Amino acid sequence: MSPSYRIAVNVEWTSKCNALCPMCPRDQIANPQLMRPETWQQILARLLPEEVFRVVIAGYGEATTHPRFFDYVDALRQHPVRFDMVSNGHLLDEEKIRHLDGAIDLLIVSFSSIDPDVYRYVHANLDQQRVMANLQAAQKLFKHTQLGISLTPMPECLPALPQTIDWLKAQGIRTLTMSPTLYNRGGSLQDHELATARLRQIIQQYGLRSQEFDFVPSAGEVFRQWRANRFKCVPRNVDLFVAASGDYLYCYNDAAHQHPIGHVSTLGISEMLRRREQMAAQPGLCDGCNMRDRYRAGELVKAGIAFARSRLQAASRNRLIFIGKSS
């Protein structure tokens, strides 16, 4: 039996990455790996529209580095669930851009700053000019897929944020997002945090889209998730992380993959959710997490109002984008 609510799913094609970002807990990933084709097929079979409203190809690695990238993208085209992808943009050449067009709804590129020194620090090991050229190409070539930007919420990125936003808008990119929390990965990262209240002010000030609502299908389903789960952690309960190994993880903050709930080869999503609903907090992950207890009753009410407002704003932006492309 399917659960009474739908979730978002993060699928990790690879836990290997071509970047060396300071906010990435890569030292915790003991066995970086590539997802095998049979595992990918098993995952696709588990993704049912009545249980999943959105799938994001993301994780701790860079999806465009997978040697089966083109084959894996092809498998998305006829699937009934919505797929999006997150990338750092470094390998996003014209061939990949054209192949992604229409296979995913939204491509989200992580971009830290127009300032070369800041970019070099935050997105270490990547070529800023190459990424910027790839963004221009994607904005020009995409006909069916939308291009969005995830702006990095680190203190180093804020001084040049207005200039970064101006450059992105000058390229015609209108979907600019930011998370109101730089997740500290279960307490493992403490050196790059900004207060959530400050980040929300920045998001509002620059008219950005808050990423805290990207994994929420509806306010009613969040309430049903809250009621069904023993551990009242909204960020955990709205999302499911499927690692490159095919393991369902307790939480996306489990970078070390120490808390698997089951494997896609033997366990469906509905059964996995029933298991997770009965699980308590994991002290090793939860005690130091800056997302824990984030959404208590008062915060949920505020978030619900903001969620409704964000949906109206998103609908308005989408109409403008559609009109712009049609004219």
What spans do the regions from the language model cover?
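Radical SAM enzyme [4Fe-4S]-AdoMet core and its adjacent flexible, acidic
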Residues: 12, 30-35, 70, 79-82, ...
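Phosphate/oxyanion-binding loops and surfaces in catalytic or ligand/nucleic-acid-binding neighborhoods
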Residues: 50, 167, 171, 292
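Short, hydrophobic secondary-structure boundary micro-motifs
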Residues: 56, 148-149, 177, 281-282, ...
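Conserved alpha-helical substructure of the radical SAM core
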Residues: 1-106, 117, 121, 125, ...
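Membrane-interface junctions of multi-pass transporters
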Residues: 254-300
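Short cysteine clusters
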Residues: 17, 21-24, 233, 251, ...
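Processing junctions and N-termini across compartments
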Residues: 11, 15-18, 227, 280-283
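Short, solvent-exposed beta-strand edge segments and adjacent coil->beta transition regions
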Residues: 6-8, 148, 286
